[in-house]
Amino acid sequence: MPRPYRLGRRNFIGIGMAGGLSLLSDPETLTALEGQHRDRPGRAKNVLVILEQGGMSHTDTWDPKPDTLVQQLSPYKPISTSVPGMQFTELLPHTSKVAHKLSVIRSMHHTTGIANGHPKGTQYTLSGHVPGGPLEMPDIGSVVAHRMGSRCGYLSPYIMAPGNSEQAKESRLGFMPYDTQVFKTGGRDLSEPGWKVPGLALNKAIGESRLKTRLNLLGNLDVGLPNHHSKKAQGWQQAIAQAEESLLNPKSKIAFDLEQEPDQLRDAYGRGHRGQCYLLGRRLIEQDVRFVTIDVREPLTPKTPGGTNLNWDHHDFIYATGTCNLPGAGGGGRGRYGIGTWWMMGSVDQAFAALINDMDDRGLLEDTLVCFVTEFGRTPKLNKAQGRDHWTGAYSIVMAGAGVPGGQIIGASDRQGGYVTQSAYTPDDYAATVYRKLGLNLEKPLRAPDGRPILLAANGNPIREVF
């Protein structure tokens, strides 16, 4: 069922300005507005986002539909969880044991046609704003870095790992300062022995002393620039200082060193790329990185033969027991594995359950908001190639930590999983929830380059059930 139209805060400002409230574009008025709506300490101090891009099938995972039409039925049956009456599918046996720590939101949806594809859908998820329009909107992570700053003096406040696949290309700085831009670790396969962040080590041919001499020279040159004191120039200077600290501080390399972890724990997460990505996310949160996004996409390695495109875009043979590139498959089958294989839900289930338990054991769930998201779901109806296509009418995300009540299902979709029937939420609401959990005041505007007020998640409201 489509969500009723509501007047968003952005619309309200627009109507107000049309009615003569052009005072909002006045710098003094904006300053007063910002002072009135201050940020306050929130329950969350950090955020860890697991972005499983490609459009994960909700009816095969978090929202089982055993009573749907036979021709649409998932082969994966509902199973019980640690919470009576709360069910996942049998693709989540490990995660079902930590259900009492999770809030599963089964009523996500969006109705804008522009976000029905992966690039725009991912942008929508990363920013909490419908893509398009004259002003490019920044990632939630960049906004958080701008408003809250860094808790870790030697690493960027916003890190994406590995940040080298399709979804990472949709990350946007927008109009935020350069020092809030996401730092992407890179790395083809984090499960490789001795994996390190490319470019983080200092070039031995230069050395620390020579580097500092060059940076001092750069600083002296900057002083003479006419725009030295502009916000843009200051952002660049802060970004350079941040990069210098990351290069020279030995803690930086340790933060990314997965070999610091005991073998037993690495095994618990799973020794593949996905498990080690999730583990790195926990390590970065432990280093007080403010906002971490893990964007897993299994790489082509000897461990994943033929797997060149292992995200969740299962247009062809979604239930294949190996490769989806079977006779009759289209382009979506090439390089992809079935949803029930180890490389897909098998590794997700193990890694996510291990992550939640590990963070809970270390006390990190007390003040870290963990979000498991995808940009949309998949069609209730199987297509001719026995796959499921893009679907924005209903899908699921998961939250945990930072005071999120565990063991609850939020919202509902219909018998087929096609449309939301209860407590509909959008990516705008998801963004508003993240901001509110961090203590950011949604009424305190950001400023566009021309001074206009831009509200956080302007068309969203926090998901009330997680507070």
Language-model region placement:
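Ligand-binding pockets and gating/stacking loops
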Residues: 1-467
